[in-house]
């Protein structure tokens, strides 16, 4: 998730460059400043982080709503063909790589579980919030992409780094492009604020389980936030900001994440067999077919990434492997303490 924070920070830097001329390496520096700012907001208190998130989410939904309305009331310059296929033997592999970015845009589906301990009636509210948010997000993304394609064509979209702004320019000229670029700039802050807010809870939970430094499990005496976990997360995200482009960073992140997502789905099946009587506040719908299909998809996505982007996959695997010695070290310490 720190790779995701770094990636969104880089995206913020790229859109910032739409308004201000940035020298070489400046995108990463802008990304670092945005990460520091959001980390400070979330250290200051949960309420400040949540209020920031609510405001930025309203702006984000409003921006996408505006883009969708452009497509409804103004004619596009391209014919809308959602079934267009370039063909070729490598189409399946290329589709898998395209899915990397798509799965990243939907990756927040899991992040609500990171703050489950701070949610009232999580057994009821988490599934409800997850389902509702996914339906809304899918509708917004599909409609917005239809507008983008009708304005730019798939080929032009593939060659653009500022798709929403370029689409707005087709409809409204340079003024419209600037407005959308500003809205996207705010949207990236909103997305990253959600990442910063939720992801630090993983490190915090690990420390509470005695799988990391105990000091990380402490909350700030005044703000009652996991300040140390937030600071560690911010430092690591800052370092990752300088390790690659936006596309490379999300490839590291999605590749590594889906290995664990697949393993988590496998754990559902294993636990159903090993502990059939265990209390389950939430039971997987469509068991065992839904987790089985999920596992197959996760396996295909990770294998395809290895074949199509071996360098990025190797870095993702390397990031996982660097964490294993620390995990085994803390696990052994936890076992020793419990034995004592």
Each PLM stretch: what is its role?
Residues 14-22, 129-196, 211-248:
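TM-loop-TM module centered on a large, flexible mid-protein loop between adjacent transmembrane helices
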Residues 251-252, 256-257, 286-340:
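A generic transmembrane alpha-helix motif of multi-pass inner-membrane proteins
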Residues 13, 26-77, 89-90, 130, ...:
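Membrane-interface loop-to-helix entry segments
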């Amino acid at each position: 998730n720190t790779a995701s924070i770094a990636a969104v920070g880089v995206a913020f830097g790229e859109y910032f460059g739409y308004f201000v001329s940035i020298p070489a390496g400046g995108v990463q520096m802008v990304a670092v400043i945005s990460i520091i700012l959001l980390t400070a907001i979330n250290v200051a208190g949960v309420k400040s982080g949540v209020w920031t998130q609510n405001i930025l989410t309203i702006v984000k939904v409003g921006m996408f709503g505006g883009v969708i309305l452009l497509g409804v009331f103004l004619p596009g310059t391209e014919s809308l063909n959602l079934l267009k296929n370039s063909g070729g033997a490598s189409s399946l592999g290329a589709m898998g790589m395209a899915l990397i970015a798509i799965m990243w845009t939907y990756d927040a589906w899991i992040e609500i579980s990171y703050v489950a301990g701070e949610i009232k009636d999580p057994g009821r509210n988490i599934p409800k919030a997850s389902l509702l948010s996914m339906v809304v997000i899918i509708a917004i993304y599909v409609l917005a992409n239809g507008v983008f394609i009708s304005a730019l064509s798939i080929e032009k979209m593939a060659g653009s780094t500022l798709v929403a702004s370029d689409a707005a320019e087709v409809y409204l000229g340079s003024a419209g492009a600037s407005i959308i670029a500003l809205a996207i700039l705010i949207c990236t802050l909103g997305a990253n604020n959600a990442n910063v807010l939720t992801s630090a809870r993983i490190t915090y939970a690990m420390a509470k389980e005695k799988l990391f430094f105990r000091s990380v499990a402490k909350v700030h005496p005044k703000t009652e936030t996991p300040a140390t976990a937030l600071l560690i997360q911010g430092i690591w995200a800052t370092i990752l900001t300088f390790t690659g482009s936006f596309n490379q960073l999300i490839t590291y992140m999605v590749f590594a994440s889906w290995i664990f997502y697949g393993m988590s789905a496998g754990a559902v099946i294993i636990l159903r067999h090993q502990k059939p009587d265990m209390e389950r506040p939430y039971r997987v719908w469509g068991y065992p077919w839904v987790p089985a299909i999920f596992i197959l998809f996760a396996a295909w996505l990770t294998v395809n990434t290895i074949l199509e982007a071996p360098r990025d996959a190797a870095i993702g695997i390397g990031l996982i492997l660097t964490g294993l010695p620390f995990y085994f070290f803390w696990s052994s310490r936890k076992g020793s303490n419990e034995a004592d």
